[in-house]
């Protein structure tokens, strides 16, 4: 029987073989295709990739951060999650208050220059310490703009009010499960210019049939090697959490990607991953005593039977 992970591995193969070479804002370069869809049956295991280790702890803490409506990296740092650091760090080193060594193009330079990487690591550690310990600094430089959490939980209206899209969609699933309006959008054109990183996963929609909750994500831009594995796990987890509160079983996670790309400096890593055989997906267990999605904490989420191949490191394009 075909392993569900092949949905992802086939995406990698397709882009490597048929992708178009493109330039990008990071200066790294990509190969990409436009318009690709994957489907995962969530009743047959939790789609945490096994051909390389994907850290569930980071996936879960980021999702809980989104769901809290938080847009400051302090919560993530408190949970030893560093995946958003570079975007906050960028605003700090480009500010008038920063007086340390030149950090221009730190993403690329830290990969190419060992001496610079030492300086970069020192400045990043100092930055993280300040975000964790200095409230004023954290409020100013730990803040990422009105990114996912703000749009999900406090979308600004023209009337000066806010909409809690996530809370509203959960209530709609309970009351009108056949609605075709079970949608949450993170793409707010007015706020995009002030965001540290405009939303890559832009809109998601729920669908209820036969007592099962399915979710489809539209992602405008997907970093196939580093980002997409996180996105698959994150929205699968979100579907489980909402199904749990609504008294539903899980159905499918459908992942639709606009610009699906592999960075040129990830080719070697992708080839290494494609040479590996998938292993059985793990099982996700939720604390049955927690009833609301907004009350879940890290200790309420458990992954069992996860036996992946080793992690494969790759640089992040900032």
UniProtKB/Swiss-Prot annotation:
GO CC, alphabetical: cytosol
The pathway that the record names for this protein is: Pyrimidine metabolism; dTTP biosynthesis
- Gene3D superfamilies, sorted: Thymidylate synthase/dCMP hydroxymethylase domain
Xref: Pfam families: Thymidylat_synt
What is one process in the GO biological process aspect for this record? methylation
Record: active site:
200
Gene Ontology terms, MF aspect:
thymidylate synthase activity
**Cell compartments where the protein resides:** Cytoplasm
> Which organism encodes this protein?
Bacillus cereus (strain ATCC 14579 / DSM 31 / CCUG 7414 / JCM 2152 / NBRC 15305 / NCIMB 9373 / NCTC 2599 / NRRL B-3711)
Where on the tree of life does the source sit, at the highest rank?
Bacteria
List residues binding (6R)-5,10-methylene-5,6,7,8-tetrahydrofolate: 223, 317
Q: What EC number(s) does the entry state? A: 2.1.1.45
- Note the InterPro entries from the entry: Thymidate_synth/dCMP_Mease, Thymidate_synth/dCMP_Mease_dom, Thymidate_synth/dCMP_Mease_sf, Thymidylate_synthase, Thymidylate_synthase_AS
Oligomer status and interactors: Homodimer.
Which controlled-vocabulary keywords does the entry list?
A: Cytoplasm, Methyltransferase, Nucleotide biosynthesis, Transferase
PROSITE patterns per record:
THYMIDYLATE_SYNTHASE (PS00091)
For the keyword Chloroplast, the answer is no
Q: Where does dUMP bind?
A: 25, 180-181, 220-223, 231, 261-263
Q: Which family does it belong to?
A: Belongs to the thymidylate synthase family. Bacterial-type ThyA subfamily.
Q: Any idea what this protein is called?
A: Thymidylate synthase
Q: Which gene encodes it?
A: thyA
What is catalyzed by this enzyme? dUMP + (6R)-5,10-methylene-5,6,7,8-tetrahydrofolate = 7,8-dihydrofolate + dTMP
């Amino acid at each position: 029987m075909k392993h569900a992970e092949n949905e992802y591995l086939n995406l990698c193969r397709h882009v490597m073989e048929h992708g178009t070479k493109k330039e990008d804002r990071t200066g790294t370069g990509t190969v990409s295709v436009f318009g690709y869809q994957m489907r995962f049956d969530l009743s047959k295991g939790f789609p945490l990739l096994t051909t390389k280790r994907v850290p569930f702890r980071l996936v879960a803490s980021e999702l809980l951060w989104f769901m809290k409506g938080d847009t400051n990296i302090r919560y993530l740092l408190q949970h030893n999650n560093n995946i958003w650091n570079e975007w906050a760090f960028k605003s700090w080193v480009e500010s008038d208050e920063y007086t340390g060594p030149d950090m221009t193009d730190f993403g690329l330079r830290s990969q190419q220059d060992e001496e610079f990487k030492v300086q970069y690591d020192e400045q990043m550690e100092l930055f993280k310490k300040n975000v964790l310990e200095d409230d004023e600094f954290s409020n100013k430089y730990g803040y990422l703009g009105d990114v996912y959490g703000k749009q999900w939980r406090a979308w600004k209206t023209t009337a000066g009010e806010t909409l809690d899209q996530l809370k509203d969609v959960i209530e709609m699933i309970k009351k009108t499960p056949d609605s075709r309006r079970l949608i949450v959008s993170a793409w707010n054109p007015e706020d995009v210019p002030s965001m540290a990183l405009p939303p890559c996963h832009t809109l998601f929609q729920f669908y209820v049939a036969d007592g099962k909750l399915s979710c489809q994500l539209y992602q405008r831009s997907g970093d196939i090697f580093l980002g997409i594995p996180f996105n698959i796990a994150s929205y699968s987890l979100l579907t489980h959490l909402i199904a749990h509160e609504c008294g539903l079983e899980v159905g499918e996670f459908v992942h639709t990607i606009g610009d699906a790309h592999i960075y040129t400096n990830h080719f070697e890593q992708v080839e290494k991953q494609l040479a590996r055989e998938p292993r059985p997906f793990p099982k996700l267990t939720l604390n049955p005593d927690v009833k609301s999605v907004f009350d879940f904490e890290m200790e309420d989420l458990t992954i069992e039977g996860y036996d992946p191949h080793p992690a494969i490191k790759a640089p992040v394009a900032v």
